[in-house]
Amino acid sequence: DLNNETIEDWNDHFKVNLMSGVELSKHFLPEMIKRDWGRIIFISSECATLVPSDLLSYSVSKASINVFSSGLAKLTKGTNVTVNTIVPGSTLSEGSKKFLEETALREKKTKDQVEKKFFNDVRDSSLLSRFLNVTEVANTILYISSPLASGTNGASIRVDGGSMGSIL
């Protein structure tokens, strides 16, 4: 929560999640526009929309990626350069694996039991009711980085197992 996150936590999240992308975009976008081709892909998070109260700095930094990406895409108007954001849901990353292992050990449960409880209690909006595997997210990144995605620009593409429910 807000009282447990330091200013350093906030600065770190913004440095890693937003400012690294700002710096890379400033460096590479002009050449992409000059060549009239390129792909800039940001990785956001479902936490940018489904904001957990214990992850405020992380969530706000991820939401800022969505805003930056949308604005940056407008600078590519009339070119073959695209700027998009991938918005993954709960993914079985190294951090998630560690969470499952530590929670299972602490609560004397199996990792499967912890995962089931997480999707029943915390992320009950997920239609998959399981963690995404990294390959599911990577496949979307592969597509959006390819020439096949030439018609997609300025989009936030959800790979969330249905957790953010939307008709758009």
Model-assigned labels for residue ranges:
Residues 30, 74-75, 150:
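Alpha-helical segment proximal to the catalytic Tyr-Lys
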Residues 3-23, 37, 41, 65, ...:
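Catalytic Tyr-X3-Lys loop
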Residues 1-11, 54-57, 115:
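Conserved mid-core segment of classical short-chain dehydrogenase/reductases
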Residues 25, 61:
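Active-site helix of classical SDR
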Residues 50, 141-142, 148, 153-168:
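Short C-terminal tail/terminal secondary-structure segment
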Residues 2-3, 50-56, 78, 129, ...:
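Active-site loop immediately N-terminal to the catalytic Tyr-X3-Lys motif
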Residues 45:
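Residue(s) in the substrate-gating loop at a strand-loop-helix junction
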Residues 77, 82, 152-154:
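Short, small/polar-rich loop/turn modules that mediate ligand/substrate recognition or access, typified
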